[in-house]
Amino acid sequence: MEYITTIGLEVHVQLKTQSKMFCACPVEYGAQPNANTCPTCLGLPGALPVLNRGAIEYTVLAGMMLGCETPPVSKWDRKNYFYPDMPKNYQISQFDLPLCMGGHVPLYDHCYPKDAQKDITRSGQSIGLTRIHLEEDVAKSTHAAAGTTIDFNRAGTPLMEIVSEPDIESPEEAFAYLNSLRQILIYGELSDADMEKGQMRCDVNVSVRPPGQEELGVKIELKNMNSVSAVRRALHYEIERQVAVLKNGGELIQSTRRWDDDLGETQQMRTKEDAHDYRYFPDPDLLPVRTAEIIEKMRPRVPELPHQKAARFVEDFGISEYDASVLSSDLD
């Protein structure tokens, strides 16, 4: 019996701003540990956040490029949890009024893995988006045998979270989605989206269910994948693991697992939290954002997108759609 796979992706993208989301500290990859910090991004008592308008503008532009709707008002919320890389013990994020709603990411054929080109079943389709919201990044933890160190240079970096609908049906489609999304972000000069540098990170939600069952299966979240290829490998393993559990009469529990690329397997981290566990509430230190002026400012900056450039190449030069898509994959 073939099980049905359902996949949704949460992609976190560091924006190419010069300063952090709520303070003036510079955003600089590779700086000396804890060099770019201040009382605000260290969460010291009495320090107040100040919005980075550039990060808001970039997020609205991303929404325009991806066909999202931007509501007239967006607000900020506190996501409450305790972890060493979050100095305030809450993260400033967005809950019920994000900057962007809806939208889609097109699946270009050339974005699929080369060894899966012949198996593309949904050519020209798009993956729906639930929302795009803006938040602050957390610090970077480095784990070693002697202990864990934390670098707060990354804490407070503007982080755009792009949440897909559960529309993805295979690891290969997830691979294509991430490549296509990365291409669009680079076109808009919103981010370098280098996964090895942590500028683009992906959490995967995956479930399986038997044919004929309408209700989605138990959702398992996967973390710790530092490349698009690793996402594909992790999904292949996890789908096989879940199917094996169900076929053997076992029960899946909603949880979070980490991918170990060296061992080629996922490992249990914790049972999964729900949104109510974070006790979101509006941030009292930040005013809501009215977006009308920002939308009008960013509208002229929407670039020609990859699929639009590819269509122009086909019309102007008479080349094949595949060749045009390959040529348009590079911004230059």
Across the structure, where does each feature detected by a protein language model lie?
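Basic, nucleic-acid-interacting segments
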Residues: 1-304, 315, 319-321
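A generic alpha-helix surface/boundary motif
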Residues: 307-308
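Histone-fold and other basic nucleic-acid-binding segments
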Residues: 311, 315, 322-332
